[in-house]
């Protein structure tokens, strides 16, 4: 019985876990990488797509579902188990991803054609997404179903977004039973939009997310007060544009609800709200159709005659022409994706407004390393959009309490529910600092816990009630490879002062394998940084190439520019291949 971490290990995106039981392979999530790791989307899967028998999807967000069409393109034909809202949202998100990737590939192919280079292929096309949709198998919360011989699962409400799930897996192999819980993305214990995460107490292993494993959020009341105070000041000025980059699933609906509460107090009435996301409009309709799965607060607001996700002041934007026309508005609120500003319509809105000191940019969600949003939040004085350098003069605000992720306190509270069975925690879905911090806190509470590493494989063993996993492994007759939990999570030498001879004598096979994995991981990251730097150089040279094509550069310089273009593309191609 094996578990392999194929993504979201010491990083927030790219969730992908492989479970092998009785010779059958089951994937949990298959998400896209975003930010500085997005080049990994092009890399081959660490398993044959046609060898996977089934997929369990925790929720629709693209960092959990975005590579499923690629998996289907490469041969996956098993069922994809998910809740109905997750299925409906994923279909919307995949269609939008196809559009964005096709547009990007078309732009890059046109550029390549001018240089005599081959066209660029998108990660997947519409036919791949459509084929993936046919594999969906809807499941109900709390119902136990068998997904392969000896493996049954139960989806539980995770309270993260509409339809999000934790997944309980009961795996039986050779009369040995192991209980594994995948947390997915956990919502806050006290949430505004969704129901609180379901309570689970029984497990041998728990994969726990750690997005905010080292941070606390403001509570709902403090967050609401902060947002309302800021918006009141902006409304009183009546001369500003407010740009809110937002995830168009769940976060956009939450912001529209908060604006509705303000209008109910007579604040901000008449100030237009431009919801510039056709995909977000579709998602909002799904939220309205599944109101019974949302929080008591939202349902109560609706029962009392309110519309939590819209009013006459909210204008839904569909076409590009309508989107561009918003730039002519002197004041108003613009809600648009993507939430990290690494694509979508928010990019052209920022290009047209971030240079104006009267305007405001309000970030209401997590900004991953390597994204435009992260650069702005970190204080960049200038940013580059479509090859143009733009000064950042608008006022920048960050309100963290809107997060649909559990914070450190909530994560530990959720983990404490497992105290009756004392499982081993495998920390995933967090940057290194956050993941390490959460693992340390779990160990302080008496749990066995370690941070998962990319491409790490562990063997899963059953245990007696109250027995630690490390004790169960001592008694297990399982083969020494792949590494056990005890090896994978072995602590570093606390003294740090052993002689070279002592180090040689005490190094264990698991530690050597772990060092090799770390070296490979650092090499991959260094390569991705190199690729990103080369892409930045290519982006900065785009203006020069455009000037050359329009005749603004001398004929003598043209051959040199062509040579540089070919060289850059060649280096980038080789770097991505590596």
Residue ranges of model-derived segments:
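Pre-active-site segment of Zn-dependent metallo-hydrolases
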Residues: 9-14, 21-134, 186-195, 378-386, ...
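Active-site neighborhood of phospho(di)ester-bond hydrolases with catalytic His/Asp-centered motifs
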Residues: 28-30, 52-61, 68, 80-83, ...
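A general structural motif
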Residues: 186, 219-224, 310-321, 340-342, ...
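Hard-cation-handling environments
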Residues: 228-371, 384, 419, 434-436, ...
